[in-house]
Amino acid sequence: MIQAIVTDIEGTTTDIRFVHQVLFPYARERLTPFLRAHQQDDDIAALLVDLRREIAQPDADIETLITVLHGFMDEDRKSTVLKAIQGIIWRTGYLQADFRGHVYPEVAQQLADWHQQGLKLYVYSSGSVAAQKLLFGYSDAGDLCPLFSGYFDTHVGAKRDVSAYQKIANQLGIAPQALLFLSDIRQELDAAQLAGWHTCQLIRDLPDNDSAHPQVNRFDQIVLSLFTE
């Protein structure tokens, strides 16, 4: 019996185009002036120390770090530091109503239904926890944060690593066979399945013919009774 559902964001609850055509360009355009202006702020300074450690350049100056971060964005690298800085920049965008967090039309209602049924809901995304809370807190369906019991990002590991799902299960104190992971990416679902989780693949376009996971097009097509131990 499923006790908790953990969902991905990009391509799952949210159109990938919102992330790549709205969020990423917004942060890219503002990254350089933001870091030059705020490099001495405590939270930013700490992140830059982490970045220097990540690239093994303890004496790198701010211009070098800016270049590195732009390179990370070009590669779509899942750098914890980059994701944290992007999240801080996006916060301004949400607060100024420059954009709203996109969720697919059926997602909010289905999450609310599961929550009302007593299921625990969590998010696991490569975006920082702060960015996750912003997207759902300022979504085009309103504030969805009260529906979630917790959030996970790359601090628990990469989404294609089995160990990340083992850590999440341990932190939640829930047996893997009582957990359901929702994602659009087959390789992430493979990792969750190897950790003992149930899985369901969200396919908003063409079916993934190489996937062995159950596939649905919408959240309201997910039938929890089909996921049994």
UniProtKB/Swiss-Prot annotation:
It comes from the Bacteria. Binds 1 Mg(2+) ion per subunit. InterPro entries: Enolase-ppase_E1, HAD-like_sf, HAD-SF_hydro_IA, HAD_sf. GO terms for molecular function: 2,3-diketo-5-methylthiopentyl-1-phosphate enolase activity; 2-hydroxy-3-keto-5-methylthiopentenyl-1-phosphate phosphatase activity; acireductone synthase activity; magnesium ion binding. CDD domains: HAD_EP. It catalyses: 5-methylsulfanyl-2,3-dioxopentyl phosphate + H2O = 1,2-dihydroxy-5-(methylsulfanyl)pent-1-en-3-one + phosphate. Keywords: Amino-acid biosynthesis, Hydrolase, Magnesium, Metal-binding, Methionine biosynthesis. GO terms for biological process: L-methionine salvage from methylthioadenosine. Pathway: Amino-acid biosynthesis; L-methionine biosynthesis via salvage pathway; L-methionine from S-methyl-5-thio-alpha-D-ribose 1-phosphate: step 3/6; Amino-acid biosynthesis; L-methionine biosynthesis via salvage pathway; L-methionine from S-methyl-5-thio-alpha-D-ribose 1-phosphate: step 4/6. Its cofactor is Mg(2+). It is an enzyme of class 3 (hydrolase). Its EC number is 3.1.3.77. Belongs to the HAD-like hydrolase superfamily. MasA/MtnC family. NCBIfam families: enolase-ppase, HAD-SF-IA-v1. Bifunctional enzyme that catalyzes the enolization of 2,3-diketo-5-methylthiopentyl-1-phosphate (DK-MTP-1-P) into the intermediate 2-hydroxy-3-keto-5-methylthiopentenyl-1-phosphate (HK-MTPenyl-1-P), which is then dephosphorylated to form the acireductone 1,2-dihydroxy-3-keto-5-methylthiopentene (DHK-MTPene). Monomer. This is Enolase-phosphatase E1. The gene is mtnC.
